[in-house]
Amino acid sequence: MSEVVVKEQLEQYISKIERLEQEKADLSQEVKDIFQDASAHGFDVKAMKSILKLKKLDKDKLAEQDAMLELYRDTLGI
């Protein structure tokens, strides 16, 4: 592989990574804006983030986590 080809490949990889990093930053800002809008309309952002986290869990894991939380709350009288 010639040095020119290697240089071009490296530049392409770097360019793609830079583009994706910018897209990631843009998406992150969009998510932040959505949370701000939801908050302005009276929604609890902390609760929304908890729901998003729970939605990522497997149904069995979620049921297990709910059962454990209920057990701990009962134990502590909460």
UniProtKB/Swiss-Prot annotation:
InterPro entries: GapR-like, GapR-like_DNA-bd. It holds the Pfam family GapR_DNA-bd. It comes from the Bacteria. One of its GO terms (molecular function) is DNA binding. Belongs to the UPF0335 family. HAMAP family: UPF0335. This is UPF0335 protein A1C_00850. It comes from Rickettsia akari (strain Hartford). The lineage of its organism: Bacteria, Pseudomonadati, Pseudomonadota, Alphaproteobacteria, Rickettsiales.
